[in-house]
From Swiss-Prot:
The gene is argG. Pfam families: Arginosuc_syn_C (PF20979), Arginosuc_synth (PF00764). It comes from Shewanella pealeana (strain ATCC 700345 / ANG-SQ1). ATP binds at A20, Y21, S22, G23, G24, L25, D26, T27, S28, A48, G130. Its EC number is 6.3.4.5. One of its GO terms (molecular function) is argininosuccinate synthase activity. It comes from the Bacteria. L-aspartate binds at T132, N136, D137. This is Argininosuccinate synthase.
């Protein structure tokens, strides 16, 4: 069995390629480039609908065909993304470097998996992505391809072609009479899905520059948000939100409702400088309005239902899971093990929370659960009917025994 790198190093033996296609400038240029570079091979465009919005998908099929693709598959992955990737991940408590809710990272495995499925369906011998050679996504996609379809060749044009700028791409398309609505003045690099939108590039490359209001698209500025708070009631079953304000909703639709209501109150903005997998630091501005509310709701119920040791273990799992997801290692035995081990704890996360939305903040102000370990009788500072404070004396003596022995030893 060969374990050689499947990335294409020469331009032979490629007859049909499935391209992860967005309709943007990069992937519009990739289609003719593939045909020219790989001996007029057939190009099948694939677009994953992960909730990036109707505007991003409008006219996509026609655009792909006009650019030279023989077919374009647009696959609806929205519900699957939220139910099978986002919820299992946040159930582990995964949050990268303490702030990033992994919006881009969680979407890459499902996109890669669907791309492989299309490749199998059409009998392709290669897959192609438009990720740059400086970013994390090239590793995420190709790591998934290696795990799911090691026989498929992988083409990464940004690591092959000589074009280095948007102007180069525009000139390339113009020379081939391929129409595009893109311009050379694009300010930000954005990536959107149902969970979040990321913003990079432009003025954001200097961390001394405050993001302008034009950066943000999913949320209003907190200072411009309503002067009155809004309260949202959420019901949870086995770690998933099933109702918003009493209305039963699917995982994806619940997220969409929360995106709208939380975004209107400026909730979910972060501006971070993160450590990329490839070794450099990068600045990113992220908006995750609904996800921020969901994450807070789950953590609030966990506070009620998980004992101390379980919470400590879940925090350790969350830290490791965050790195696995960020680093593109979803389809690995370790990731599968962490997800499976976390499920019994997630199954305890049942109950109801009320979240207060106000000026950029999402605060859980009410919470209850049928699985709650909290007992008002035990926690009260009143009479000792159920908790005899004298019992603490023996516990403290045993708990501090090692410290006592160490101190006595040092006095000898």
């Amino acid at each position: 069995m060969s374990i050689e790198n499947s990335a294409v190093s020469d331009h032979s033996g490629v007859n049909k390629v499935v391209l992860a296609y967005s309709g943007g400038l990069d992937t519009s240029a990739i289609i003719p480039w593939l045909k020219e570079t790989y001996d007029n091979c057939e190009i099948v465009a694939f677009c994953a609908d992960v909730g990036q919005g109707d505007a991003e998908l409008e006219g996509l099929y026609e655009k792909a065909i006009a650019s030279g693709a023989s077919e374009c598959y647009i696959v609806d992955l929205k519900e699957e993304l939220v139910a099978d990737y986002i919820y299992p991940t946040i159930a582990t408590g995964a949050i990268y470097e303490g702030t990033y809710l992994l919006g881009t990272s969680m979407a890459r495995p499902i996109i890669a998996k669907a791309q492989v499925e299309v490749a199998r369906k059409v009998g392709a011998d290669a897959v192609c992505h438009g990720c740059t050679g400086k970013g994390n996504d090239q590793v995420r996609f190709e790591g998934c391809f290696a795990a799911l379809a090691p026989d498929l060749k992988v083409i990464a044009p940004w690591r092959e072609w000589e074009m280095v700028s948007r102007e180069d791409l525009l000139d390339y398309l113009a020379e081939r009479n391929i129409a595009t609505a893109a311009s050379a003045t694009k300010i930000y690099s954005r990536d959107a899905n149902a969970w979040h939108i990321s913003h990079e590039g432009g003025e954001l490359e200097d961390p001394w520059n405050e993001p302008s209001k034009g950066v943000w698209t999913m949320t209003v500025a907190p200072e411009d948000a309503p002067n009155q708070p809004e309260y949202v009631s959420l019901e949870l079953e086995q770690g998933k939100i099933t109702k918003v304000n009493g209305e039963a909703l699917s995982p994806y639709k619940a997220l969409m409702v929360l995106n709208e209501v939380a975004g209107a109150h400026g909730v979910g903005r972060i501006d971070i400088t993160e450590n990329r997998l490839v070794g450099m630091k990068s600045r990113g501005c992220y908006e995750t309005p609904g996800g921020t509310v969901m994450f807070a709701a789950l953590r609030a119920i966990e506070e009620l239902v998980l004992d101390k040791t379980s919470r400590e273990w879940r925090e350790q799992v969350g830290a490791q899971m965050a790195h696995l997801v960020y680093d593109g290692r979803w389809f690995t035995p370790l990731c599968e093990s962490l997800l499976g081990a976390s499920k019994p704890l997630a199954d305890l996360v049942n109950g109801e929370v009320v979240v207060k939305l106000y000026k950029g903040q999402a605060s859980v102000v009410k919470k209850r659960s049928p699985n709650s370990l909290y007992s008002e009788e035990f926690a009260t500072f009143g009479a000792d009917d159920v908790y005899n404070q004298k019992d603490a004396e023996g516990f403290i003596r045993l708990y501090s025994l090692s410290s006592r022995i160490r101190a006595l030893h040092s006095q000898k």
